[in-house]
Amino acid sequence: MSNYQDRWQTVKVNVEEGIAWVTLNRPEKRNAMSPTLNREMIDVLETIELDQEAHVLVLTGEGESFSAGMDLKEYFREIDASPEIVQVKVRRDASTWQWKLLRHYAKPTIAMVNGWCFGGAFSPLVACDLAIAADESVFGLSEINWGIPPGNLVSKAMADTVGHREALYYIMTGETFTGTQAAKMGLVNRSVPLSKLREATRELAATLRDKNPVVVRAAKTGFKMCRELTWEQNEEYLYAKLDQAQQLDPEQGRAQGLKQFLDDKTIKPGLESYQR
């Protein structure tokens, strides 16, 4: 059984029933992302990706916050006083885990927004495949309130998930919105009362855990890449992903699914998965 107790200073990891619960652990700072946290999250994601007991990753925050964004003192004021090359390294670490690793992660990822979610936290939120928020969560793009535009890929995250007018409204005004509103505008898949958040997330994670991992990976990667390609390019690319998945799949899910549906008549693919 995977045991990551006390392995990282700013992140907690617990693997239960195939689900890796990754918790940003700076509650006294509303889980603001510091250079240390960014470095540790790179190690966390790379470690969990290779952990054969972890099939789905859930990202959340300790206490009453998902994350308040970047730590203004550690990430900005202290780093601003450092040599330029240090600033380059710090920015690279932030980008590496907040979107480069998460967006192309080999396993399904879910953001579980349990409270405050501000600024830079929008990058890992949107980089996760799916997201569930507590109704009571508070979201905000407050950068405008202290004199800068949204940093890193926050604007890109909004542009990819939220409509033009709504995205610009919150970027330009700095107003906050709730988890319920976030679900209506498409920033998260859905919202539930805080008291039901963990169970709802666990159920979704279990659903993903029980799917064929090779096929899930091909499906999510194909979707994310197809948005960047033309129709003609997509026809070639997505057929290639289909063929690749069949070649890499050790359990031959396509053959099993067809057999159980056409020959055994034990499943209805429109309503349920094949039996693995």
Task: Locate the predicted segments by residue.
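C-terminal alpha-helix plus adjacent terminal tail
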Residues: M1-E17, G174-G179, E199, E203-A206, ...
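Crotonase-fold acyl-CoA enzyme core
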Residues: K100-P213
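Conserved CoA-thioester-binding segment of acyl-CoA-metabolizing enzymes
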Residues: M1-E62
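Glycine- (often His-adjacent) and acidic-residue-rich active-site loop
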Residues: G61-K100, C117, N145-G147, T230, ...
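Terminal peptide-recognition signature
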Residues: V22, R26, M41, L59, ...
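Hydrophobic alpha-helical segments typical of transmembrane helices
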Residues: A94-Q98, L153-A157, E166, A218, ...
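Charged catalytic carboxylate motif
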Residues: T36-E40, A94, L101, A200, ...
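Acidic-histidine catalytic/liganding microenvironments
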Residues: D51, Y105-A106, D264
